[in-house]
């Protein structure tokens, strides 16, 4: 905070827009404070004047003040200097931009080269984005070689003949050089034009000349560009002219930016930037000197280059092709660029993420005895962190105590560290000596230590999802670690092996409210990621739950009673035991009956439930049945208590609420842990030992496996193995061995598992689900199994072995890493080694994966961080682009979604009819579920039948739509909001529905109710066509579920709901549906990114070829995810899934035909061998094998081939028969292809398809006739033939589609919806390909183009377009994520897909995608390419409107997200019901401030006269709509805090000088009371009517009749000296207590209660109901309270009736009743702004500390009765005069708004109205006393 401005509690105004630009040389000079001339920093130990550490630039030394702003080191921000460069220099960041501009304009006259009429130029003008526009213009200009328009004069004649002369560009005709950049130079190349008549020989010298362009030359070109041209080029001449991109003046950053470090007492070590600047200054001086001395050009250019180099490296020291500037040590200097860049740079390291105060970090330890939303905090932390609490009447006592304890409270207590006064002064309680300094007033802030129950944020890095930061309530505990409940570890992903976690203490009410409402642990139990809970019962508690709920668990009385003690809600009633004789015993299930909430119904199965067991209660007790909160049957295990979808925790959270779920998790732990403690559980080595028979079985299994492997090896070596499709023989062998060995391990394991007894402790843990799995048991007991590296068996490391002592090429199990021992038996050394290899790979994988997924997550978050739900329900980003019209297409929040079953989908037609259709036409139809009269209606009334027919046909169309459009895969469970089935079950239980009785509902009612309900379930309100359509789409799926579940026949027949139960269900569905809608302001982009990124961290990095997944290998896991979101051009395993037409897909043969047609077959793939022979006689041959077929071929030659033309060289190709058959090729086909390809250049003969060997013989045909030159030719022929051979093998396609390298056939199950029988599944054949060529494949006639798809996104967008690619993207993401069994809710994936596709092209989630958006430069630069983006932003003068998250975080503002997205308004209606605040008398200790003796002017009678009602009772102040802080129940004591009482805010309309409330003529001065009229003598301070001795206060007030005994002037309470009379007591004004915490009104002896105040008389005019004197804050205004009767003798101020216990305080006092007039709508007292922080006095340039309420303070001189402000004749009081009359001695000094305290001249620094300790009369008082006080000072004339 800058000390030059007075303290202000007001909020700092928000930055609305950030404008980027380039500083012009003039601006740099103007904003600088000095011209830096010297490169030295210090001289004789002092900063050198004019040097780099000049004190005018700002100070970095605590002892030195800044010369410019006179602030100290902490406050001075630093001031820039500047350096005049000897020559202009290039700015390295703008080189490329300057080059582009130079290429666009004429080198000579700076006009744009392109013609404005040109088409390209016009295109460019349409582009808004300046950077792209420049690119386009450059495009238009790049071919121009000269500046058009100059030569027009020469060709004037030609124009006359042409069409009218084109408007000349006015160019200069100069030839344009070709510009390039080399390093730091710009180079211009001129092409020298030869004149036509020149002889070519005459110019021997080169026809080009190069010249280096200095920045000065470029600058002169850029300076000439006109402003209009700048705009055309996309620059903004106001903020960034092109010529400013060249440095003429270098700004010198102040020392605070480049601080130096003290090495020892004398020497300082300077920052890199300082060194670099010193170099620049030095070289600049050198250059200047050389120019002055007139050095030769080449020397000057060398010096220029050197300076240019230093300036460049000062900006960016990582330039490509430039040497690094280094320090003496050889370390490269850190340039400005590298300060901004990267993770630790300014943007990401200091703006996006900073270190914060009020945080703590320590190790975590478990504590199952605290609640899940609690956090044990060490005392050492609690006594160090603070929370600022504002002093209010309610907490002042407590805070006083804390302040007394101070920073080092006694053991077991917390204290406070600081007091912050209302003027911003901070008192450190460590150093406060006097107790008077600790004095608290309302409105002060106390920074108190943390207390039990404070809310904090708790976090564990890496914060991968929303639940990594949650809110906890703290509980201070001994020792030094955070204590955490065990159930909360899963969302944090924490364990207690030394993890540390961070705690942050929120520092304001708003933050605490958000923590409490949005982030508390119970609110986070259900996560939107997979719409399931993320917390459940874990570890020993889970094990205990399994053990305690077993059937044979009984609990003794003593244990059960002790267990009850852990139950918080225990009411002393012990539940009845299950067994009474021989002694009372309780079952373990009864413990759960205590803690499951009563409205819960649940039906689930245990993890080990076998489908064969059926019935209500299964033999294995595996069916968990909870009804009405009672566990009736079933053993609880991880499936019920864990984090699965629909688990008990989930149901409790959804049905009863977060708090119930919290209690359940807590109670389960406490009760079960206590029982487990009594019961005990242990596990030892004995639990892993299997019995001897099992061991024999295991050994047998393993030896069998070994035999099988030996067998495989024999087959493999004998080449007898059949290769599997798509695999080589070796792959096949490895795969088979792996299968055999894995099966052996599993079999051994399962036999071991079966042998373990029910009592086995290891098994207990596995079945409960608390630790371990089936595979762990089998590895411990039976056999560890095969060790893999990279998904294969351990490879041969060297020389055909894995380890040296195995034989060569040993493929046996032992040698290749099969561990046959169990952990129990121990591993042999080589087994141990292989096991270590496998384990090491896992570690490496994890380490590599972490960084990969971390980067993916960061990119996802940056791409989607600004996507949120707006108030119209649409999903948009910060630019306002619509990403989705409804979140997840249905507008539901993922948290409230559950998986529900669509019953009608799987039903056969007959079942469907039985469930939904009334058989009305059947004669004998006599249903048991309808009452007789309803049945008559159904049979008799025609209209009713139409209703039911309509219902039935709707259900039928629903079912058809589900089967054909929605759930095409036949899956009947879908995530939908509102679990209807469970609501029905709850209703049956709540309303005690008897399933044997008939329902009293008429079926028509049900149909109507459901129809009406559907109309009420609005997601998109509005009745225009679009809204209606959108609403229909959004709710279609849910309505289908609703209609089929609440079909009238089902309600009557299945659920038997009574009318009231049915209505309850309907109501419940409606309210739950609306609750499930997503909240506007929700940042779903971030949630989506986290929901995708978090499962990615759990994925495996390299996915191996899983044994038997499929023949084709697909990339999965992280690499595939990376490919998808990077939109990779070349993916690792491109592949098509080709579906065939029904005919082709029926049989394998059909599929085989298509496979052959698609697979790209080259000659090579069917060739066995090729040979080149010299075979001189074409008609015969020297190869015996071929002799026969050649002769027979030429016996009947096809065409006339002259043998002499045939080359003697022969290419002989032997084809592979199997492949030919497989590919369905014939010899003739191949020969035909060859002839087509090579025409008559080759001759080709082949043998029969059935011959033993298939041979092709190919020879070259030579055109030359006779073999005259035989020798030479044949030499070339064989070479040529070899070339042809290789070409043929690779290039020649025999058939198939290019790029489709392999095609595999596989059989898949296909489910198809069938009207009659529900879903039918059938097998069909389909093809998988390696390689992609979607377009060509889809053209094949047997391929089904609708289903065929590719995994290559770019191909899909090219072939099928953007909508198709969105769907493909979704499916691909689905595949990757669900591959290892994860599930992510659809809406998150949808947000990602829509983000990537909504622009109409695929936006990769990389810097090339995200940063090419039109978001603000600040947001883009926080991702990647920081410096480039900022430089571009400056060059093109971009603006950032700060609409995103990142930008606001950088500026430290509240981003428009979540709660920051809306404005808050006050509900005036609610205020009428606010509760009045009765202040207790807590002020005794502060009375000293009040005694008249201490009040400097209290003795004068006039002073007492000041009580005159004109001042106190006039309702004027209440007219101010803003001035109601007076009433808010809160403010009672805050009145002294400038931040609390808007009533005084200078901007309050009530204070405007013209406000009628202040003009004495204002009717507000109740006309019935002459005492208020300005002409009334009562105004004159000497008026006897007001003199304290006057018997009557106001002639019109009957209750003042002088005869009233208690008013008699002799009444003791009247004595003017009575302290209780101290006129300064503001309690006389109806606004009273709210204004003065020090008011005696709070002390029991206070006169505030004395009847002398007219305000107490019930008949007093000031009581009129509109009169504010009903101040709710005044404790004693109840007119009917007995103690107020005017005649009541108990009025003496000392009367006990005033003690705070006085009945007057009783809340039943009518003044609390809402009918009390003070609650009337006219009562301004409840105003929105009440306790808010109104800026009130804060702006006054004068003494900041005087709170606006000060006029009441007894010590304040304002009260001096001589002050003219009280006399109507005072000029400053004249009613017509605005209060700011120039004669007002003070107002001149302050701007009108500030006047309330203008009177307090700034020389009153220590004056605090209530602290008499510091009070000294200053000039201010003297003026007051002399009567020159300005009216505007006191409330009356207050502006």
From Swiss-Prot:
Zn(2+) 2 binds at residues 106, 109, 147, 172. The tandem 7 residues repeats in the C-terminal domain (CTD) can be highly phosphorylated. The phosphorylation activates Pol II. Phosphorylation occurs mainly at residues 'Ser-2' and 'Ser-5' of the heptapeptide repeat. The phosphorylation state is believed to result from the balanced action of site-specific CTD kinases and phosphatase, and a 'CTD code' that specifies the position of Pol II within the transcription cycle has been proposed. ATX1 seems to regulate phosphorylation statment. Zn(2+) 1 binds at residues 66, 69, 76, 79. Residues 1727-1745 have a biased composition (Polar residues). Keywords: DNA-binding, DNA-directed RNA polymerase, Magnesium, Metal-binding, Nucleotidyltransferase, Nucleus, Phosphoprotein, Repeat, Transcription, Transferase, Zinc. Residues 785-795 are annotated as: Alpha-amanitin binding. Pfam families: RNA_pol_Rpb1_1, RNA_pol_Rpb1_2, RNA_pol_Rpb1_3, RNA_pol_Rpb1_4, RNA_pol_Rpb1_5, RNA_pol_Rpb1_6, RNA_pol_Rpb1_7, RNA_pol_Rpb1_R. Residues 156-166, 1818-1839 have a biased composition (Basic and acidic residues). GO terms for cellular component: mitochondrion; plant-type vacuole; plasmodesma; plastid; RNA polymerase II, core complex. InterPro entries: DNA-dir_RpoC_beta_prime (IPR045867), RNA_pol_asu (IPR000722), RNA_pol_II_repeat_euk (IPR000684), RNA_pol_N (IPR006592), RNA_pol_Rpb1_1 (IPR007080), RNA_pol_Rpb1_3 (IPR007066), RNA_pol_Rpb1_3_sf (IPR042102), RNA_pol_Rpb1_4 (IPR007083). The keyword Transferase applies. One of its GO terms (molecular function) is metal ion binding. It is an enzyme of class 2 (transferase). Residues 1544-1813 are annotated as: C-terminal domain (CTD). It catalyses: RNA(n) + a ribonucleoside 5'-triphosphate = RNA(n+1) + diphosphate. It is found in: Nucleus. GO terms for biological process: transcription by RNA polymerase II. Its EC number is 2.7.7.6. Sequence repeats lie at residues 1544-1550, 1551-1557, 1558-1564, 1565-1571, 1572-1578, 1579-1585, 1586-1592, 1593-1599, 1600-1606, 1607-1613, 1614-1620, 1621-1627, 1628-1634, 1635-1641, 1642-1648, 1649-1655, 1656-1662, 1663-1669, 1670-1676, 1677-1683, 1684-1690, 1691-1697, 1698-1704, 1705-1711, 1712-1718, 1719-1725, 1726-1732, 1733-1738, 1739-1745, 1752-1758, 1759-1765, 1766-1772, 1773-1779, 1780-1786, 1794-1799, 1800-1806, 1807-1813. DNA-dependent RNA polymerase catalyzes the transcription of DNA into RNA using the four ribonucleoside triphosphates as substrates. Largest and catalytic component of RNA polymerase II which synthesizes mRNA precursors and many functional non-coding RNAs. Forms the polymerase active center together with the second largest subunit. Pol II is the central component of the basal RNA polymerase II transcription machinery. It is composed of mobile elements that move relative to each other. Component of the RNA polymerase II (Pol II) complex consisting of at least 12 subunits. Interacts with RDM1. Interacts (via CTD) with PRP40A, PRP40B, PRP40C and CYP59. Interacts with MEE12/CCG1 and MEE14/CBP1. Binds (via CTD) to ATX1, especially when phosphorylated on 'Ser-5' of the heptapeptide repeat. The C-terminal domain (CTD) serves as a platform for assembly of factors that regulate transcription initiation, elongation, termination and mRNA processing. PANTHER family: DNA-DIRECTED RNA POLYMERASE, DNA-DIRECTED RNA POLYMERASE II SUBUNIT RPB1. This is DNA-directed RNA polymerase II subunit RPB1. It comes from Arabidopsis thaliana. The gene is NRPB1.
């Amino acid at each position: 905070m800058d000390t030059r401005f007075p303290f202000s509690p007001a909020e700092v105004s928000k930055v609305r827009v950030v404008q980027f630009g380039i500083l012009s040389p003039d601006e740099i000079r103007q904003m600088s404070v000095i011209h830096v001339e010297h490169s030295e920093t210090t001289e004789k130990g002092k900063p050198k004047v004019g040097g780099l550490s000049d004190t005018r630039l700002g100070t970095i030394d605590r002892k030195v003040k800044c010369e410019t702003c006179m602030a100290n080191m902490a406050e001075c921000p630093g001031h820039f200097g500047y350096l005049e460069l000897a020559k202009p220099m290039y700015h390295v960041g703008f080189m490329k931009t300057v080059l582009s501009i130079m290429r666009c304009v004429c080198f000579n006259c700076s006009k744009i080269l392109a013609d404005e009429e040109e088409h390209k130029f016009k295109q460019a003008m349409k582009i808004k984005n300046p950077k792209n526009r420049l690119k386009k213009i450059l495009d238009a200009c790049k071919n121009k070689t000269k500046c058009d328009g100059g030569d027009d004069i020469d060709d004037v004649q030609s124009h006359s003949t042409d069409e009218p002369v084109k408007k000349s560009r006015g160019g200069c005709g100069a030839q344009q050089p070709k510009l390039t950049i080399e390093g730091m130079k710009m180079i211009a190349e001129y092409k020298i034009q030869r004149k036509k008549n020149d002889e070519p020989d005459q110019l021997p010298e080169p026809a080009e000349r190069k010249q280096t362009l200095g920045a000065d030359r470029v600058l002169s070109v850029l300076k000439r560009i006109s402003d209009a041209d700048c705009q055309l080029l996309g620059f903004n001449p106001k903020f960034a002219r092109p010529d400013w991109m060249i440095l003429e003046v270098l700004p010198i950053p102040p020392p605070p930016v480049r601080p130096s470090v003290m090495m020892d007492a004398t020497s300082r070590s300077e920052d890199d930037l300082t060194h670099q600047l010193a170099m620049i200054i030095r070289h600049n001086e050198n250059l200047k000197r050389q120019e002055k001395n007139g050095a030769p050009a080449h020397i000057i250019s060398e010096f220029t280059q050197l300076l240019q180099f230093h300036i460049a490296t000062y900006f960016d020291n990582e330039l490509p092709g430039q040497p690094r500037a280094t320090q003496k040590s050889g370390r490269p200097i850190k340039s400005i660029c590298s300060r901004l860049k990267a993770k630790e740079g300014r943007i990401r390291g200091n703006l996006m993420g900073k270190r914060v105060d009020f945080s703590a970090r320590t190790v975590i330890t478990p504590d199952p005895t605290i609640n899940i939303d609690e956090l044990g905090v060490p005392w050492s932390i609690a006594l160090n962190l603070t929370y600022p609490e504002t002093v209010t009447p309610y907490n002042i006592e407590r805070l006083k105590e804390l302040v007394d304890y101070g920073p080092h409270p006694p053991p077991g207590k917390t204290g406070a560290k600081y007091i912050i006064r209302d003027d911003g002064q901070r008192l450190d309680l460590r150093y406060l000596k006097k107790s008077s300094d600790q004095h608290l007033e309302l409105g002060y802030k106390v920074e108190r230590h943390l207390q039990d129950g404070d809310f904090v944020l708790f976090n564990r890095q890496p914060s991968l999802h929303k639940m990594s930061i949650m809110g906890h309530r703290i509980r201070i505990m001994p020792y030094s670690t955070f204590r955490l409940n065990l159930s909360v570890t899963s969302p944090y992903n924490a364990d207690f092996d030394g993890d540390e976690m961070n705690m942050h203490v929120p520092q304001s009410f708003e933050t605490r409210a958000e923590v409490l409402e949005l982030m508390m642990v119970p609110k986070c139990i259900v996560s939107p990621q997979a719409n399931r809970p993320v917390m459940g019962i874990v570890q020993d508690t889970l094990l205990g739950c399994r053990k305690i709920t077993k059937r044979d668990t009984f609990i003794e009385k003593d244990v059960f009673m002790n267990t009850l003690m852990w139950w918080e809600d225990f009411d002393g009633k012990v539940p009845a035991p299950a067994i009474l004789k021989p002694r009372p015993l309780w079952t373990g299930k009864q413990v759960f009956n205590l803690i499951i909430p009563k409205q819960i119904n649940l039906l689930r199965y245990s993890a080990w439930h076998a489908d064969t067991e059926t019935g209500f209660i299964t033999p294995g007790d595996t069916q968990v049945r909870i009804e009405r909160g009672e566990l009736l049957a079933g053993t609880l295990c991880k499936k019920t208590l864990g984090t699965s979808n629909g688990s008990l925790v989930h149901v409790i959270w959804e049905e009863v609420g977060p708090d119930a779920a919290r209690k359940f998790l807590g109670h389960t732990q406490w009760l079960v842990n206590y029982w487990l403690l009594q019961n005990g559980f242990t596990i030892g080595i004995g639990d892993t030992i299997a019995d001897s028979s099992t061991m024999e079985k295991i050994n047998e299994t393993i030896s069998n496996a070994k035999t099988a492997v030996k067998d495989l090896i024999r087959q493999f070596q004998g080449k007898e193995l059949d290769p599997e499709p798509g695999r080589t023989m070796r792959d096949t062998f490895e795969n088979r061995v792996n299968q055999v060995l894995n099966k052996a391990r599993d079999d051994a394991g399962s036999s071991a598992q079966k042998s373990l007894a029910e009592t086995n402790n290891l098994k207990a843990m596995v079945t409960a689900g608390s630790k371990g799995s089936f595979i762990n048991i089998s590895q411990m007991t039976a056999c560890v199994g095969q060790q893999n590296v990279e998904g294969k068996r351990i490879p041969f490391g060297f020389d055909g072995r894995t380890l040296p002592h195995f034989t060569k090429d040993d493929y046996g199990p032992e040698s290749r890493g099969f561990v046959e021992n169990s952990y129990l038996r121990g591993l042999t050394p080589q087994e141990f080694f292989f096991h270590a290899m496998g384990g090491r790979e896992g570690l490496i994988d994890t380490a590599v994966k972490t960084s990969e997924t971390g980067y993916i997550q960061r990119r996802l978050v940056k791409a989607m961080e600004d996507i949120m739900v707006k108030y119209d329900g649409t999903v948009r980003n910060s630019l306002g682009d619509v990403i989705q019209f409804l979140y997840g297409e249905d507008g539901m929040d993922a948290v409230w979604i559950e998986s529900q079953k669509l019953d009608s989908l799987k039903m056969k037609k007959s079942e469907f009819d039985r469930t939904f259709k009334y058989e009305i036409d059947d004669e004998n139809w006599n249903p048991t579920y309808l009452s007789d009269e309803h049945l008559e209606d159904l049979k008799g009334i025609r209209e009713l039948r139409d209703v039911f027919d309509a219902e039935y046909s709707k259900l039928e169309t629903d079912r058809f739509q589900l089967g054909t459009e929605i759930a095409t895969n036949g899956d009947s469970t879908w995530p939908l909001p509102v679990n209807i089935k469970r609501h029905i079950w709850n209703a049956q239980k709540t309303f005690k529905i008897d399933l044997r009785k008939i329902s009293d509902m008429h079926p028509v009612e049900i149909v109507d109710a459901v129809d009406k309900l559907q109309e009420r379930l609005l997601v998109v309100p509005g009745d225009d066509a679009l809204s209606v359509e959108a609403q229909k789409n959004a709710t279609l799926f849910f309505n289908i579920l609703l209609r089929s579940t609440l079909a009238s026949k089902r309600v009557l027949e299945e659920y038997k709901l009574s009318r009231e139960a049915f209505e309850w269900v309907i109501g419940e569905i409606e309210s739950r549906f609306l609750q499930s809608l997503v909240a506007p302001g929700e940042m779903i982009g971030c949630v989506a990114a986290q929901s995708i990124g978090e499962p990615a961290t759990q994925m495996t990095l390299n996915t191996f070829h899983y044994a038997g997944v499929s023949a084709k290998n697909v990339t999965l896991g992280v690499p595939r995810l990376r490919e998808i979101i990077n939109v990779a051009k070349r993916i690792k395993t491109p592949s098509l899934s080709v579906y065939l037409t029904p005919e082709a897909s029926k049989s394998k043969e059909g599929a085989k035909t298509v496979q052959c047609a698609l697979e790209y077959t080259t000659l090579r793939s069917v060739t066995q061998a090729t040979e080149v022979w010299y075979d001189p006689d074409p008609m015969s041959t020297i190869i015996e094998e071929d002799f026969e077929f050649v002769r027979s071929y030429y016996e009947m030659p096809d065409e006339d081939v002259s043998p002499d033309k045939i080359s003697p060289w022969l290419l002989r190709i032997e084809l592979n028969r199997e492949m030919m058959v497989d590919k369905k090729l014939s010899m003739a086909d191949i020969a035909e292809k060859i002839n087509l390809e090579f025409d008559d250049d080759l001759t080709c003969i082949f043998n029969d398809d059935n011959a033993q060997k298939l041979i092709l013989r190919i020879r070259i045909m030579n055109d030359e006739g006779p073999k005259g030159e035989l020798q030479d030719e044949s030499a070339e022929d064989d070479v040529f033939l070899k070339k042809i051979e290789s070409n043929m093998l690779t290039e020649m396609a025999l058939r198939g589609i290019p790029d489709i390298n392999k095609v595999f056939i596989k059989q898949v199950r296909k489910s198809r919806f069938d009207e009659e029988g529900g879903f039918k599944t059938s097998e069909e054949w389909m093809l998988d390909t390696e390689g992609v060529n979607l377009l060509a494949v889809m053209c094949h006639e047997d391929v089904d183009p609708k289903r065929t798809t590719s995994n290559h996104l770019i191909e899909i967008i090219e072939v099928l377009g953007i909508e198709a690619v969105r769907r493909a993207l979704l499916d691909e993401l689905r595949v990757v994520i669900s591959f290892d069994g994860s599930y992510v809710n659809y809406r998150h994936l949808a947000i990602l897909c829509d983000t990537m596709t909504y622009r109409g092209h695929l936006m990769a989630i990389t810097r090339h995608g995200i940063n090419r958006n039109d978001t603000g430069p600040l947001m883009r630069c926080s991702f990647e390419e920081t410096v480039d983006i900022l430089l571009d932003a400056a060059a093109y003068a971009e603006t950032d409107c700060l609409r995103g998250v990142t930008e606001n975080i950088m500026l430290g503002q509240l981003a428009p997200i979540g709660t920051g997205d809306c404005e808050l308004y006050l509900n005036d209606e609610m205020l009428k019901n606010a509760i009045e605040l009765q202040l207790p008398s807590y002020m005794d200790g502060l009375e000293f401030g009040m005694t008249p003796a201490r009040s400097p002017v209290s003795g004068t009678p006039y002073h007492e006269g000041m009580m005159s009602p004109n001042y106190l009772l006039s309702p004027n102040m209440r007219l101010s709509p803003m001035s109601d802080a007076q009433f808010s129940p809160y403010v009672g004591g805050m009145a002294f805090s400038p931040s609390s009482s808007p009533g005084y805010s200078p901007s309050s309309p009530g204070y405007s000088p013209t406000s009628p409330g202040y003009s004495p003529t204002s009717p507000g001065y109740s006309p019935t009371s002459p005492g208020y009229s300005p002409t009334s003598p009562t105004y004159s301070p000497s008026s006897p009517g007001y003199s304290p001795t006057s018997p009557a206060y106001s002639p019109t007030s009957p209750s003042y009749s002088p005869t009233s005994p208690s008013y008699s002037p002799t009444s003791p309470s009247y004595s003017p000296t009575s302290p209780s009379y101290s006129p300064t007591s503001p309690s006389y004004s109806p606004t009273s207590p709210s204004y003065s915490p020090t008011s005696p009104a709070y002390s029991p002896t206070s006169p505030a209660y004395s009847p002398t105040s007219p305000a107490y008389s019930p008949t007093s005019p000031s009581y009129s109901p509109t009169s504010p004197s009903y101040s709710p804050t005044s404790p004693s205004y109840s007119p009917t309270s007995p103690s107020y009767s005017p005649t009541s003798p108990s009025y003496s101020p000392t009367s006990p009736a005033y003690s705070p216990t006085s009945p007057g305080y009783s809340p039943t006092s009518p003044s609390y009743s809402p009918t009390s007039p003070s609650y009337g709508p006219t009562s301004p007292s409840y105003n929105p702004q009440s306790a808010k922080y109104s800026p009130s006095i804060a702006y006054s340039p004068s003494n900041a500390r005087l709170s606006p309420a000060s006029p009441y303070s007894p010590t304040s001189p304002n009260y001096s009765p001589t002050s003219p402000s009280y006399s109507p004749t005072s000029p400053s009081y004249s009613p017509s005069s605005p209060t700011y009359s120039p004669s007002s001695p003070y107002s001149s000094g302050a701007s009108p708004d500030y006047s309330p305290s203008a009177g307090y001249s700034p020389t009153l620094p220590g004056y605090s109205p209530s602290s008499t300790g510091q009070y000294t009369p200053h000039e201010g008082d003297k003026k007051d006393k002399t009567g020159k006080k300005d009216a505007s000072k006191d409330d009356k004339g207050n502006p």
